[in-house]
Amino acid sequence: MYVNKKNMRRAIILFSILFADFILLLLNCFEQLEQVLIFTGGYAIGTLVLTECLLYKTTSKINFFLLFVGISFTFEFGQSMSVFLGGYNNMNPIWFLNINSGFFNGKEIWEAFFFMHMLMMSFAASYIIFYKDNLQINEERNSIITVVSQKKLKKECQIGYFLLLVSIIPTFYMLKKDIMTIQIYGYGATLQATSGGIEKIFTLLSEFFPISVIWLLIYEKRKQRKLMILLLTFAYMFLQLVGGSRIQVFRFAVILFLMYSLYYKKINKRNMIFLFLAGGIGVFVLSLISSIRTMIYTSSNLSELIQKAAVDLWENNFIVETLRELGNTQIINTLVYKECPKVIDYAYGTSYLKMVFSIVPNLWGGVHPSSIDVDSIFSPLYSKTTGLGSSFVAEAYWNFGFLSIIVCFILGKIFTYIDIGLNEVCKLGVKDNKLKAYIFFYLCFLLIFWVRSSCNGFGRSVLFAAVPIIMNKITIK
């Protein structure tokens, strides 16, 4: 296997950081909570910038993995980062979703941070080692342009519109339900809500919404139709924010960016500045909606709430506030590291096998085997009222303990195949292989969820994603 020497030197830098993580984990330099959060926050920001620079040097583009690592750091270490940037006083210890609520001491947060950081470094180093630009490998393929008949393209678009029609009402109904739950009972109620009957069917049908959007953005050539799909997607993203789901917004934002920067090449260096400004506004809106959600019980006057929330965010640094809220995944990471295997035994890989179980419908009633994940096992140790979610690093540690460093190294290699595949379908001429493009973009959409969740439901999601492919094979011959 050929390994680029420059890539190996970059990977060695990350392995050096991994070794430094191990030394710092053993040393326990600080015990006071404030000092721990400030140090780990500065460390996370510094290593994030360095890692992203090394990844960009490796790939020469802003690709899926670079975005995945950036989002991962924001979620996995966000609360430490918010303390470093905004000060310890910005973390209210009364709020149970803040890591300084009193459940963990400084030593526990310190050790969990540096071990999870080791996993991130192993993950990124592996990617850099195995990544290769497939420009020369696919040179012959790029010269082949497939002629797609208009009749075939029309049928492929019809598949996407059919799935969109099937899913649009269930999707927006469930979003409306979440928003109404927040207005009446508060945000925490959406985290505890369960569905049954028609709502369970609606939840399943809503799986087709992102699938149909990705499919149509690839197959639909008419600009007005594509604009309609984009407006529908932006409406969905906005309502997801109001309903409390930030990770769904990140998933669509990443996919839209990848499609329009790599696949359609509509985003270049000149309009990248505008994109960053739009991103900053988006972060402010995210924080604003989050603040309104938490303050909604204090007033029924919406304009008054928006004004008060906007002023508070501007005065208290909305970026710090966003990091604090997104970074509560750091709590589940710390909890898993603290309680496993002392209270909860290792899963020994069974967590990953549950992806297969999620394909089988729950015909026998009760708890579905695939629903037993990091969140359901560990969250009750911290809070009896709400779930804490999960992350791919927490899941790796729960399964294999210290061997999860090797697991994350393997995951890094797997992610290289996704980006190499994306490179291939995004090259001129190969764009005609739309089915392959759909598969890779959907995989990206699916994997982003792993930043904030376990992979136990991935099997079912892949099964749903296969539906338009099967329909395509049946209807088009």
For each predicted feature, which ranges?
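Small-residue-enriched transmembrane helix-hairpin modules in multi-pass membrane proteins
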Residues: 187-195, 283-411
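Hydrophobic alpha-helical transmembrane segments
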Residues: 104-124, 196-211, 318-329
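Hydrophobic, membrane-inserted alpha-helices
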Residues: 19-24, 46-48, 208-214, 231-239, ...
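Membrane-embedded catalytic interface detector for glycan/lipid assembly enzymes
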Residues: 34-36, 95-103, 131-268, 279-298
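Hydrophobic alpha-helical segments
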Residues: 385-477
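N-terminal "leader" segments that precede or initiate the main folded domain
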Residues: 1-143, 252-287, 453-477
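Membrane-interfacial loop-to-transmembrane alpha-helix junctions, especially the N-terminal start
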Residues: 5-15, 59-72, 157-160, 223-230, ...
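Hydrophobic, aromatic-rich transmembrane alpha-helices
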Residues: 46-52, 209-221, 407-424
